[in-house]
Amino acid sequence: MKKWIGLLTLVLLMTAATLSAHHGSAISYDTAHLWTTWATVTQFNYLNPHPSMKFDRTLKDGTVEHWDSELLTNPSALARAGWTKSRSIEALKPGTRVKLYVGTSRVGGFSGIVMKIENEQGENVVGERSNVMGVDKEGVAGGLQPGPEDRKEPNQ
């Protein structure tokens, strides 16, 4: 009996640590200062607890940045908003050009949390955050993401 109680305690502690670590997007990402960018989807995964997406962003000088991101919303909320797995995967297939509203990772690098996605027609593609606004470094609504000189490198 003591063995089972110990095992149950261990499982509960591990689960609690995972849950508290997971629900920290404001700690992990700068969601107060969102930026926008046009990007090309390279991979989209409709996963729990949050879908993930890889995208390429081309700078004005032609340099391509390869980004990893997760969506703020979860598959259950996406489905309730009409974005089923098949519809989301079709809308975000590799090669699709989208406008993203992103909160950059607080540790630097090319990772972030996507708060909103629009297609080339300006329609909200995935998610329920239609009121999200992004700015560029000059403070222009709907602007572009700050350049590499404005981001710190990971672990600095």
Name the predicted role of every residue range.
Residues 1-4:
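Positively charged n-region of N-terminal signal peptides that target proteins for export
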Residues 6-18:
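Bacterial N-terminal signal peptides
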Residues 21-35:
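Short boundary/loop segments of OB/S1/cold-shock single-stranded nucleic-acid-binding domains
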Residues 37-41:
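Conserved hydrophobic positions within beta-strands
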Residues 47-57:
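Short aromatic-glycine-enriched beta-strand elements
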Residues 80-99:
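Short nucleic-acid-contacting surface segments enriched for D/E, G, S/T with interspersed K/R
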Residues 103-132:
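OB-fold/S1-family single-stranded nucleic acid-binding modules
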Residues 123-156:
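Extended, charge-rich, solvent-exposed interface segments
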